[in-house]
Amino acid sequence: MPGRSTSSSSSGSTGFISFSGVESALSSLKTFQSCISSGMDTASSVALDLVETQTEVSSEYSMDKAMVEFAMMDRELNHYLKAVQSTINHVKEERSEKIPDLKLLVEKKFLALQNKNSDADFQNNEKFVQFKQQLKELKKQYGLQSDREADITEGVDEDMIVTQSQTNFICPITQLEMKKPVKNKVCGHTYEEEAIVRMIESKHERKKKACCPKIGCSHVDMRMSDLIQDEALRRAIESHKKRRRQSN
């Protein structure tokens, strides 16, 4: 809660208003974002486990539903943080002697942001998008596509599909089957984590741009931040190895 300050030159205050308490509370709220992030990681991992073991659960315990709820919490928290920070910045710029109703100002800004909510917002949530992509890819590996997706692949040579899947297991740098695959968010290609990290670091040390090593790819300025763990592919590779051992 904001309080009165006897010195207008104190750090974190403007006029008679001190924002140190508000900013401290903001910092605490930001740590809650990591809890939401961890929850999304757990829900994603459980969802992939369910696909891998082909376990059916009721809609009440759907991981898709859990991920949507986490994404909604993340959006709401981001809106609240944005509303508070925007209000603080505005009051500091105004430098008014009169103490405004900060709670009312924050609520107005927060509601304005919430009123703009749409399902399209989830496309900006990296973990949610990654979850949907990996779930779709793993279902495809196990032949669990939706009817619509299955219709698209119906009639396609099964051996060709298997061969294509196995080709996707090969790192374009090492030319070996991947153990810890990472995906490039920009172009969608996958690589062995250690190999691509070493390649990017080597290029950047020489002040050069790192190009995607996949032949024909137009992504010519790779960053470490472009890489994300490809959990679905890792599981597919492990499953492929297991089947291969069982057939020998």
UniProtKB/Swiss-Prot annotation:
The modification Phosphoserine is found at residue 118. Pfam families: zf-Nse. Zn(2+) binds at residues 187, 189, 212, 217. Sumoylated, possibly via autosumoylation. GO terms for biological process: cell division; cellular senescence; double-strand break repair via homologous recombination; positive regulation of maintenance of mitotic sister chromatid cohesion; positive regulation of mitotic metaphase/anaphase transition; protein sumoylation; protein ubiquitination; telomere maintenance via recombination. Its EC number is 2.3.2.-. The keyword Translocase does not apply. This is E3 SUMO-protein ligase NSE2. The gene is NSMCE2.
